[in-house]
Design a protein with these regions (language model features):
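Gly/Ala-rich beta-loop-alpha elbow adjacent to hydrolase catalytic centers
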Residues: 97, 101, 105
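Conserved loop-alpha-helix segment in the C-terminal half of the alpha/beta-hydrolase fold
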Residues: 207-240, 245, 252-253
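Active-site nucleophile elbow and catalytic-triad environment of alpha/beta-hydrolase enzymes
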Residues: 176-193
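Short beta-strand/loop motif that positions the catalytic acidic residue
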Residues: 203-205
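Active-site loop/oxyanion-hole signature of alpha/beta-hydrolase fold enzymes
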Residues: 52, 58-94, 110-111, 135-138
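Conserved HGGG/HGGXW glycine-rich cap/lid loop of the alpha/beta-hydrolase fold
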Residues: 22-65
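Flexible "cap/lid" loop of the alpha/beta hydrolase fold
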Residues: 70, 110-111, 115-116, 120-156, ...
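Short beta-strand immediately N-terminal to the catalytic nucleophile in serine-hydrolase-like folds
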Residues: 95-97, 122
Length: 257
């Protein structure tokens, strides 16, 4: 895959500088309709640099599509990640989330802040307290989602072309792996607590991505002096379209190698 140019605008963080050869623990949280397979190219690259990396799949999605797909909620998915981190015995976790995964990561931080050292949102939702993912969308999109809620049906994925995926190889790779999203996961509000002082916060905007809701989130993050921001010149699924740039951005934000 060709690597597109990357532009990063990193703001100073009040935390201590981290050694570039320090070993980190990364838990990568995929977005909606996907699974742990979304990190197929990023996870090995981080492991090759000596880091611990896991890519859990959320209930009802990916290879877990047979499990509670109709009834899973956002709380279910938050519990997936909380339990994963606790059962693995992880501490000082860098939690990397993409798209819907930002809702899950935010809820996870509220549950186990003592186990998290850093949050990286990759073109992800960063909810405000008491808001659901649907609240972030336009009225037109909300009406579309409401149809599935009213009919108690899971929500089919967006067309890959809408997400900027046009490479035939990527289309062939992704199409059989996409799974309908349990509608309850998008409608449940999330509890957001103030970010603990010890947790580093970063937001990455994919500049060719869909959705002005991500632009609004980026604007909000840019105004926060405690959030480091970066951009990648690619579409919404940066970990598949430009995995090298995605890895570099993650490592630069964490100031590690």
């Amino acid at each position: 895959m060709s690597q597109l140019p990357m532009s990063a605008n990193l703001k100073n963080n009040k935390g201590d500088q981290q050694s570039r050869n320090e070993r980190h623990t990364f838990v990568l949280v995929h977005g909606g309709w996907c699974g742990g397979w979304l990190w197929r190219y990023v996870a090995p690259a981080l492991r090759e640099r000596g880091h611990v990396v896991t890519t859990p799949t959320l209930t009802g999605l990916g290879e877990r599509r047979h499990s509670e797909n109709r009834t899973a909620t956002l709380s279910t998915h938050i519990e997936d990640i909380v339990a994963h981190i606790e059962m693995e015995g992880f501490q000082d976790v860098t939690l990397v989330s993409q798209s819907y995964g930002g809702m899950v990561a935010t809820g996870t931080l509220a549950r186990i802040p003592d186990r998290i050292r850093s949050m990286i949102y990759l073109d992800a939702f960063v909810p405000e307290d008491g808001k659901s993912l649907v609240d972030c969308f336009s009225p037109e999109d909300q009406a579309r989602f409401m149809t599935f809620k009213d009919e108690d049906r899971s929500i089919p994925p967006f067309p890959l072309s809408y997400l900027g995926i046009t490479d035939p190889a990527l289309v062939d790779f992704m199409t059989p792996k996409l799974v309908n999203q349990p509608w309850r996961t998008l409608f449940e509000p999330v509890k957001v607590l103030p970010c603990p002082a010890h947790v580093r916060m970063s937001y990455v905007r994919c500049t060719n991505s869909v959705g002005d809701h991500f632009d609004r989130i980026m604007e909000r993050m840019t105004r926060d002096p405690n959030v480091r921001t970066a951009t990648i010149d690619t579409t919404h699924l940066c970990m598949l379209t430009v995995p090298e740039a995605t890895v570099k951005t993650i490592l630069d934000l964490e100031e590690i190698g």
